[in-house]
Amino acid sequence: MTDPPAYVILGRGHWAKRMHVIIAGENRKVSVIEETRQYPDENKFAYIARLTAAMIASGAQIAWLCVLPGPHVSLMTQAALEAGLHVIVEKPWYGSKEDTERLQALAREKRRLLAVHFEYLVLNEVENWKTNFHPGAALQFGGHLFLSRSDPSSIPALHNLGCHLLAIREFAVPASSVSELQCGYGCSDERLVWIEQGGQRLSCIDLFTHGQPIIQRFMRKVEGALKGIAFPFDLDFALRVEKQVNAYESRMSG
C-alpha cells in the first residue's frame, strides 16, 4: 500500500490554521509556508522561484492555497506546478480566461491536478440533486447565504458567498434558471438552497446544519483523482461559476 500524499498549506490566516488541523486529523503529513506575500522589491519571476523552492523543500505532493483571491493566486499556482505539486485553490476563482488556459496547459504538461475547493459540492444532498434533477432545464434555483460574522476579506458578498450557491447550481442543475440569490454578512446565519418548478418548491438543502465531513470528502476526491478517478471541480468549472456570479450581478444592477 502506498503512503497517502503529503500536503503543504500556503497561508497563515484562520482558514490555513483550520485546514492544518483537518488535514493532520486525516493522518496526512502537512507543513505550512506562511510567508506567501510578494516582497515590494521582488518581481514576479523571483516570487515564483522563491515559492517553488519552498514547496520543493516541503516534500509535499499537494499544495493547498489558503489565501484570499487576487493576482497572486495565479502566480502561486504556477509556482506549485513548477515545483511538481498538485494544487488546490480556494474559491472564488478570479483568474482571467487567458490565465486559466495558461495554468491548465501547464498542469497538463506537468501531469498535475488543478482543483478548486467548493466545499458544499460533496454534500450527500447536493449529489442527490445531481442524480435526481440534472440538468434541471425546467427548474428554478434559489439560495440564501447569510453569516452573522463580519467580512474579513473585503470581497463582495455575492462573489465570496454567492459563488457557493451558484457552484451548487452549476454542478447539480446547470440548466435551471436563477430565481433568487441573497448573500450578506452581519445577519442571522442562514445557508439554504432550493429548487422549484412552477412556483412549487421541490427540494431544499440546509447548508448550515448538515454535520457532514465535507472537507475530508473533498480531500478524498482529490486523492482519488490522483489515481485516475474523474474530478469535476477544476478551473473550467470555477470559471463557469464566476461567469454566473458576474451575470447575476449585472442582472441585478441593470
Regions found by a protein language model. Give the residues of each.
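Beta-loop-alpha module in the N-terminal Rossmann-like domain of NAD(P)-dependent dehydrogenases
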Residues: 41-88, 92-106
